[in-house]
């Protein structure tokens, strides 16, 4: 069996700190995966996908290839986390909303009763 693939999927990832961050966290096999759009379907069909973070421009493009999409990610309309389960299903989540909420709470910001505009949807 081929080693599982772990990494950040996107285009033009030279600015990313993901590899050194994951290495520091004990994940030495994490890598940057830069693909052209036409290569995305074949890549996502690989059975040895372990786990991926997904960034632009593929946060929406990967969704049709996912077998299971978290309801919150479905509502947001984009995903940023993929995992191939042991049954072969490709599952997807969006951690942007939870991360944003956590950051706001840590900063002491409450949106309760407030009108808020968020530009973009993480895609």
Where do the protein language model's features map onto the residues?
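Phosphate/diphosphate ligand-binding glycine-rich loop within oxidoreductases
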Residues: 2-109
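Conserved beta-strand elements of the Class I
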Residues: 7, 117-119
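Short acidic/polar capping segments at secondary-structure boundaries
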Residues: 96, 122-123
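Short helix-loop-beta connector
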Residues: 109-115
């Amino acid at each position: 069996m081929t080693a599982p693939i772990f990494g950040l999927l996107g285009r033009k990832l030279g600015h990313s700190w993901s590899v050194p961050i994951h290495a520091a966290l004990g994940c030495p096999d994490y890598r940057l995966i830069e693909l052209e759009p036409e290569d995305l379907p074949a890549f996502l069909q690989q059975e040895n996908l372990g786990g991926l973070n997904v960034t632009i421009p593929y946060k929406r493009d990967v969704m049709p290839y996912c077998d299971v999409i978290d309801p919150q990610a479905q509502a947001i309309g984009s995903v940023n986390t993929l995992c191939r389960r042991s049954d072969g299903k490709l599952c997807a989540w969006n951690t942007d909303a939870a991360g944003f909420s956590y950051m706001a709470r840590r900063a002491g910001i409450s949106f309760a009763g407030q009108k808020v505009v968020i530009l973009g949807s993480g895609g």
